[in-house]
Amino acid sequence: MGEAPAQIPTSFGHELRACLRCRLVKTYDQFRDSGCENCPFFKIEDDHERIVDVTTPNFNGIISMMDPRRSWAARWLRIGKFAPGCYTLAVSEALPEEMQFICQQARVQYVPPKRI
């Protein structure tokens, strides 16, 4: 594998949130304590108000990805280069423009959700 795995959610209730950029799923408290393993440039562990800006409780489905480089599902979902962990299949909200600008400054790609 190579890279360190992301934290696995400690509960599966209403406190789950998904990162709007990479779709990593963790609890609010986990995002507050350690941020997003795939999106460290957001620095949400330092700015707790930013958690609400870059994550959402509204998402569809969860997949556990253990070996991203070999997973066909990870390639299909375009999460094959992210840390092993739990990911949502889809988010319906877009990342706010200010956060999209941070992605551009960090030279990382942001793909908005598809309109269904």
From Swiss-Prot:
InterPro entries: RPABC4/Spt4 (IPR029040), Spt4 (IPR009287), Spt4/RpoE2_Znf (IPR022800), Spt4_sf (IPR038510). GO terms for biological process: regulation of DNA-templated transcription; transcription elongation-coupled chromatin remodeling. The keyword Aminoacyl-tRNA synthetase does not apply. A zinc finger (C4-type) spans 19-39. GO terms for cellular component: nucleus. Keywords: Activator, Metal-binding, Nucleus, Repressor, Transcription, Transcription regulation, Zinc, Zinc-finger. It comes from the Eukaryota. SUPFAM superfamilies: RNA polymerase subunits. One of its GO terms (molecular function) is zinc ion binding. It is found in: Nucleus. Belongs to the SPT4 family. May regulate transcription elongation by RNA polymerase II. May enhance transcriptional pausing at sites proximal to the promoter, which may in turn facilitate the assembly of an elongation competent RNA polymerase II complex. This is Transcription elongation factor SPT4 homolog 1. It comes from Arabidopsis thaliana (Mouse-ear cress).
